[in-house]
């Protein structure tokens, strides 16, 4: 990836609230299925904003830090997804999205970020990201002291 897009906690919350507003009325949803790990934090934010208490996970491994690898389903939520929102942080090349669509064909699949290759596979997303861009999520970064430029 040649570019990086840094996401802050407040940006993520703003984007999640925007997505939640598009998913109203919340009564139409039975629950949320968060794709682990990227969808866990956005899933919690959606659950809060929509007042949804039924939250489950589908655990899929497809990245090793910044390298994409073979998809492996570690745990899945039951059912075909009817009445559920499936949330992930990002749709990239579409590998995970294809697996999600096969497991939950009746779910409403949403992400915060979408790259061009995966965009057609989700029902809704908030932010367009160029395909060659790596997203730095706030949960992957630490807060560090940065000394003043003057050095004083």
From Swiss-Prot:
EC number of the protein: 2.4.2.-, 2.4.2.22
One GO term (biological process): XMP salvage
A GO CC annotation given for this chain: cytosol
Membrane topology type: Peripheral membrane protein
UniProt binding sites for guanine: 92, 135
Keyword Metal-binding listed: yes
Binding locations of 5-phospho-alpha-D-ribose 1-diphosphate: 37-38, 69, 88-96
Binding-site positions, Mg(2+): 89
Stated role: Acts on guanine, xanthine and to a lesser extent hypoxanthine. Purine salvage pathway enzyme that catalyzes the transfer of the ribosyl-5-phosphate group from 5-phospho-alpha-D-ribose 1-diphosphate (PRPP) to the N9 position of the 6-oxopurines guanine and xanthine to form the corresponding ribonucleotides GMP (guanosine 5'-monophosphate) and XMP (xanthosine 5'-monophosphate), with the release of PPi. To a lesser extent, also acts on hypoxanthine.
Family label: Belongs to the purine/pyrimidine phosphoribosyltransferase family. XGPT subfamily.
Protein name, as recorded: Xanthine-guanine phosphoribosyltransferase
Taxonomic lineage: Bacteria, Pseudomonadati, Pseudomonadota, Gammaproteobacteria, Enterobacterales
């Amino acid at each position: 990836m040649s570019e990086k897009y840094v996401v802050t906690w407040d940006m993520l919350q703003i984007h999640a609230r925007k997505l939640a507003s598009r998913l109203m009325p919340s009564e139409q949803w039975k629950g949320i299925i968060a794709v682990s790990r990227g969808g866990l934090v956005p899933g919690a934010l959606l659950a809060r904003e929509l007042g949804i208490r039924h939250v489950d996970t589908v655990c899929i491994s497809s990245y090793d830090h910044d390298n994409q690898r073979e998809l492996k389903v570690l745990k899945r939520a039951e059912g075909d997804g009817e009445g559920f929102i499936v949330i992930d942080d990002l749709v990239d090349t579409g590998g995970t999205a294809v697996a999600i669509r096969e497991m939950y064909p009746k779910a409403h699949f949403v992400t915060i970020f979408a790259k061009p290759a995966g965009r057609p596979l989700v029902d809704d997303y908030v932010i367009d990201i160029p395909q060659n861009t790596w997203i730095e999520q706030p949960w992957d970064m630490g807060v560090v002291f940065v000394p003043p430029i003057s050095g004083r």
